[in-house]
Amino acid sequence: MENKSVPVLLDGKIPAGPIEQKWDRRREELRLVNPANKRTYRVIVVGTGLAGASAAASLGELGYQVEAFCFQDSPRRAHSIAAQGGINAAKNYPNDGDSVLRLFRDTVKGGDFRAREANVYRLAQVSGAIIDQAVAQGVPLARDYAGYLDNRSFGGALVSRTFYARGQSGQQLLLGAYQAMMRQVGAGTVRLHPRTEMLDLVVVDGAARGITVRDLLTGKIESHAADAVCLCTGGYTNVFFLSTNAQGCNVTAAWRACKRGAHFANPCFTQIHPTCIPASGEHQSKLTLMSESLRNDGRVWVPLRAGDTRAPGAIPEGDRDYLLERKYPSYGNLAPRDISSRAAKEVCDEGRGVGPGGRGVYLDFAAAIGRLGAATIRGRYGNLFEMYECITGENAYTVPMRIYPAPHYAMGGLWVDYHLESTIPGLFVLGEANFSDHGANRLGASALMQGLADGYFVIPYTIAHHLAQTRPGAVTAAHPAFAASRLEVESTTKRLLGIGGRRTITDFHRALGQIMWEHVGMTRSAASCREALARIPALRAEFWEDVRVVGSGGTLNRELERAGRVADFLEFAELLARDALYRDESCGGHFRSEHQLPDGEAKRDDARFCHVAAWEWRGPEQEPRVHIEPLSFETLPLATRNYK
């Protein structure tokens, strides 16, 4: 099943010169649009989470005509709202040695040297401005006793650089971006389309010129034309069925763009988050994240011996294994997510896991409560403790939390160059929907940073460069490509409704998730990837023969929405497994069991795989073709990650 085609080299359009000057130089080189002409250009923004709302707000403020789409009832329901722990920025307020260069180094190292250096440095460079923007918007970031902005630590760093709003950081930052966007809605520069789902990208003469959508209330299929399109639609880890993502999170917009010519980069780079509430049974439809910030004060441990079923309070210190402190003494409980997740799986596989099925480890706050008092811990994490008790019925102030790794974030995404432009001219991809900044493993508190960096501080410059070379309104929705797109979407809708099978959509999604978790999950191998590649097409064929989609297409129909998303997951999952088989190394969250160092850590193969693998869709009857973008590391030389 390995891909045998000759790879084509992709140009990331990386600026020349020293890394600290690249972004400043490029901004000076980019073409501009006359302020009086900006209102003649129309930009579509799909998705209104942190990346989408900040992009729509920024572009509207500049004077462009923006059409913003989201499938939620309100932009405030975007999944960015679920981010808990915080946002990184190189402000060095604690005076503990942080800098732009150190944030850059930590991020590249955390991603196991599989991210583009120039993009990561730019991210670190603009991080401080994000905090200034948020404060100016009134985002209630935590402050210390003196009134200064407070910081806490996160995984993979030896400094405190994470700004936060208790355990609701994503929600508060999203409200700031949302208010900025709604200001532009009021000003008339942004037009909002809620309850509207993108189902196709319209490409005319090789360039992105609009989208086709379905009104989720009426079922009406419509097309919208624009001079550029920004996809800000998040990640795809719901391909595993059970994940920390909201049930509505999907790959549909990105996958439909891929099928129109946008290459999909590194889809096998998926993050398994170490601190989630363990699954309680097969009836479950999603998992709940417990913020990484909890590991500032919580200690991860399991019984020292297999089969020890005593209550946690009855197990003395000498019979406990504080596994992260033992394995990674320099970083302790704040080791990066990929290695922390594998460490938890390792002890559970040894029979030392806790809770039902032995699939859990303890996250214990007793020492911190004894040192600081329960009131201090409540002030830092109160809403998280309340959430945990609501779900489990257990009081984490008196007994340790039980946690276990779960699918959480997608480092892979649509390939973009330094301008955030995909392989389709005019299609820009922001936030988690692109691949660019996190390599093979994202550090905690960096997702919010990337989404807002892309939306507030990158896309306003780079999209202008594209638009300055485009005649406004050159293509309208009257072009035949839009009618063809609508016809194709309507045909797929009718096909789904006409199957009339016996199995539910959830049944197929759960079956796909089991294949993915078992064969392409936390640990993979060539054999397991091949098994997934054999089973996914068979399941997909069953779906199109035996799924039952009730209702009609001319009204609100949640089953129809879910059926289309699962159909896309059934196609995308095959690409993810193929990429995992192709990447014959271990790096970050992509852990191939054949490739381990003697101590069990990931063993990279820089000679063969120090590159981005971007996949070109060639139709349902042909294997996708891989294209590569070589990665060079000049500022931070390649090295084996070491958190010990």
Language-model-detected regions and their locations in the chain:
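Glycine- and aromatic-enriched mobile tails/lids
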Residues: 24-25, 30-42, 55-58, 62-64, ...
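Core beta-strand elements of the Rossmann-like FAD/NAD(P) dinucleotide-binding domain
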Residues: 39-41, 219-228, 423
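Glycine-rich Rossmann-fold phosphate-binding loop(s) that bind the pyrophosphate
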Residues: 47-50
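Short beta-strand "acidic-cap" motif of Rossmann-like dinucleotide-binding folds
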Residues: 65-70, 266
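Conserved N-terminal glycine-rich FAD pyrophosphate-binding loop of Rossmann-like flavoproteins
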Residues: 72-105, 271-275, 282-286
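Conserved redox-cofactor binding core of oxidoreductases
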Residues: 133-220, 232, 276-289
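Glycine-rich loop(s) and the adjacent beta-strand/alpha-helix scaffold that form part
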Residues: 228-283, 287, 355, 438-461
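An anion/pyrophosphate-binding glycine-rich loop and adjacent beta-alpha core
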Residues: 256, 262-390, 461-465
